[in-house]
Amino acid sequence: MEKELQIVGFRIGRETFGLPISIVREIVRVPEITSIPNAPDYIEGVINLRGRIIPVVDLRKRFGEVVIKADKRNRIVVVELENRNIGLIVNSA
């Protein structure tokens, strides 16, 4: 019997993507983001999530999508990759 893969789906622009639920730690509304000087343009900065400092990547910029102004539907998907937490800004999750 094949193991079922559960995913969290989200959109970036008009494209839909998915991440294995096993790496998703949480999904939060976009809080205040502190910018990081001299970081690549797709690194929005960092957030303080209950005492944890999480770097935040804007996937629209990373994938060359048109960047639109943030709105209340945007979310940050916090994932764990190689024992590090990273926040991914997405259009909706």
Model-inferred region functions:
Residues 1-93:
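An acidic, low-aromatic, low-complexity terminal/linker signal
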